[in-house]
């Protein structure tokens, strides 16, 4: 899959699939898809996108990711556009330095 096909799939197929389940609207507070752009003097990134999903709590995050709807409708779609052997996930807490 080309990078352009990946971006299209993530925007037009996978994101709507996620947003269609009620748990997404209930638990996600902010959802950001970022795609690399050419930048002089910077090497090509190792990833095709960065996805940020923000939640009020770890419990809310788990309520989404372990919900029946997510496990049956959203998670199985990952193999259609992601290389699961090279994908990473970070759970983090934000520390604002400049606002």
Question: Where do the protein language model's features map onto the residues?
Answer:
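Macromolecular interaction modules
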Residues: 1-99
């Amino acid at each position: 899959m080309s990078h352009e096909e990946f971006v299209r799939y993530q925007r037009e197929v996978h994101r709507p699939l996620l947003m269609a389940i009620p748990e997404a609207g209930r638990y996600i507070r902010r959802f950001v898809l970022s795609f690399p752009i050419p930048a002089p003097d910077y090497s090509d990134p190792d990833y095709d996108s960065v996805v940020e999903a923000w939640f009020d709590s770890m419990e809310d995050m788990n309520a989404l990711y372990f919900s029946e709807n997510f496990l049956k409708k959203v998670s199985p779609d990952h193999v259609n556009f992601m290389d699961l052997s090279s994908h990473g996930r970070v759970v983090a807490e934000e520390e604002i330095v400049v606002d």
